[in-house]
Design a protein with these regions (language model features):
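Basic, amphipathic "hinge/linker" alpha-helix immediately C-terminal to the N-terminal HTH DNA-binding motif
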Residues: 1-18
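Extended ligand-binding regions for polar small-molecule ligands
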Residues: 16-17, 133, 214-247
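N-terminal winged-helix
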Residues: 17, 24, 30-62, 66-68, ...
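Flexible hinge/capping segments at coil-to-helix
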Residues: 30-31, 103-114, 118-140, 225-228
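Beta-alpha-beta core module
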Residues: 99-107, 112, 176-223
Length: 256
């Protein structure tokens, strides 16, 4: 695009954002709510499996504050957080470990091992817990590095750690389309239990031992009013979960 087109886009974008904020302000006013926080989650995640608890706990403490939640692809979440269109985002753990988040804070809120998803006719389908070395015999359906480089590099580094390079057979445009590209019995893709396709009736999911995945919360240094309170709620929920695990003798999932 030309410079004129870029400038026009920025002007229109600013106007649209201002219009959306005005509509949101009016909605909050009509509903008796004075403030709002904007939260971003992954469109490929079952975000309700962790976010619902935080939202309920926050509303109990701050009933006058509305929470606006939107789901997007990882790269869109990153961009919106940097441009202050979102106050806090929840993304995958490997984003924290492979992306430079200068000027941001990150915190792990959910821990779980990686999961391998496969067809029902996969030769290793009866193996209940996989090892990384089992991936050596598989064809990996990845996400294109053009769209999500952190996913690609994470899997390559994981396999190289165990002495082999992954056999990549396809690069999908996004996480949602990986399941539709399991075309042969040896085709698999890697995710974790928060992925929307985990537990799907169309694929078999197995944990991969000695691996670490999960969900991280990311926010900028410039803290909006009530963001600190929301972060505290998330931390308290996590602390309560850890205490329950200790009392019930349960180990962290990633150690299983």
């Amino acid at each position: 695009p030309t410079e004129a087109a870029k400038n026009l886009y920025q002007v229109w974008k600013k106007m649209i954002v201002e219009m959306q904020e005005a509509v949101e302000d009016a909605r909050r006013y009509m509903g008796g709510r004075s403030e709002s926080l904007k939260i971003g989650v992954l469109d490929s995640h079952k975000s309700e499996s962790y976010l619902w608890e935080y939202v309920e706990a926050f509303h109990d403490l701050y009933p006058d504050i509305s929470l606006a939640v939107e789901s997007e692809r990882p790269e869109v979440l990153h961009k919106k957080l940097m441009e202050n269109e979102l106050d806090v985002i929840f993304t995958v753990r490997y984003d924290m470990e492979t992306i430079s988040w200068t000027g941001h804070h990150m915190e792990l809120v959910k821990e779980t091992p990686f999961t391998v998803c496969m067809r029902a006719d996969n030769p290793l389908v009866d193996k209940q817990v996989w090892e990384v070395k089992d991936l050596k015999e598989c064809n990996l359906v990845m996400i294109s590095a053009l769209h999500l480089p952190s996913y690609n590099s994470m899997i390559v580094e994981l396999c190289l750690k165990y002495g082999f390079f992954p056999n990549i057979v396809y690069n999908a445009q996004n996480a949602a389309s990986q399941i539709y590209n399991l075309l042969k019995e040896n085709d698999v893709f890697i995710c974790d239990k928060y992925h929307k396709d985990y537990g799907s009736s169309h694929v078999i999911s197995r944990p991969i031992k000695n691996t670490k995945s999960g969900v991280v919360m990311v926010w900028k240094n410039e803290r909006k009013k009530y963001l600190c309170q929301f972060i505290d709620v998330v931390r308290n929920c996590r602390q309560h979960e850890q205490q329950e695990n200790i009392q019930n003798g349960r180990m962290p999932e990633e150690e299983k």
